[in-house]
Amino acid sequence: MAGHSQFKNIMHRKGRQDAVRSKMFSKLGREITVAAKQGLPDPTMNPRLRLAIQNAKAQSMPKDNIERAIKKAAGNDGENYDEVRYEGRGPGGVSVIVEALTDNRNRTASNVRAAFTKSGGALGETGSVSFMFDRVGEIVYKSSVGDADKVMEAAIEAGADDVQSGEEEHVIICAFEDIGEVSKALEAALGEAESIKTIWKPQTNTELDEEKARSVLKLLNVLEDDDDVQNVYTNFEVSDEVMEKLSA
């Protein structure tokens, strides 16, 4: 079993749910504000804002919070966020991409660098690992929308490139530039998605033993606990046996 979603599941099971939820809403709100500032505050005219709102709703973010984040973009509170990407190597040589929205580049860079260093990894230059990933669209549906065959058929009709169906969800991959059209076609066939976003998908994975996997998990926890960090992507994989130990 491969991918950052493994560790996401572990973190959600082990975590302080209220604290995790609060931090998630804060990050979703920041993405909505940035999207609204960069384009029109009307989601029908702003694709990035539309996706940000849809993802916020999928995570049960209250409507008031969403509206407040949009209004914040029109205010003069002086908060301007820069989009920054960091790349580096984690324990076991795992490649890591970190996306952040920050109002203080020095603070964020210092925090991210410290996280890598303490884990035994190292922060690299922009472009040092991203060439080993593909920028793609990811559309996720709960398994309740239908079986694998139904979702595969809908995905093919919509122009998607790949489908991975599991017990809990269907993950549909499409070309980066096609995410708007594909997600719209899928919504017509399957209903509203659980999430729609662009991701960094690894071209190949690095297998980790239990010790290294625990070190990577610790690094990911530290990074995702940072308020400025929006997304973290890695190229690890672990065996089912190691996965069970990490989940215990």
Swiss-Prot record:
State its location(s). Answer: Cytoplasm
**Major site of localization recorded for this protein:** cytoplasm
InterPro entries (UniProt xref) = Integrase-like_N, TACO1_YebC-like_2nd/3rd_dom, TACO1_YebC_N, Transcrip_reg_TACO1-like, Transcrip_reg_TACO1-like_dom3, YebC-like
The GO terms describing molecular function are: DNA binding
A biological process term (GO) from this entry: regulation of DNA-templated transcription
By its UniProt entry, which Gene3D superfamilies does this protein fall under?
1.10.10.200, 3.30.70.980
Q: Which UniProt keywords apply?
A: Cytoplasm, DNA-binding, Transcription, Transcription regulation
Superkingdom of the source species? Bacteria
Any one cellular component term from GO for this entry?
cytosol
Q: Which family does it belong to?
A: Belongs to the TACO1 family.
What is the name listed in the Swiss-Prot or TrEMBL entry for this protein? Probable transcriptional regulatory protein Oant_1200
Instruction: Please tell me the species this chain comes from.
Output: Brucella anthropi (strain ATCC 49188 / DSM 6882 / CCUG 24695 / JCM 21032 / LMG 3331 / NBRC 15819 / NCTC 12168 / Alc 37) (Ochrobactrum anthropi)
Q: What is the lineage of its organism?
A: Bacteria, Pseudomonadati, Pseudomonadota, Alphaproteobacteria, Hyphomicrobiales
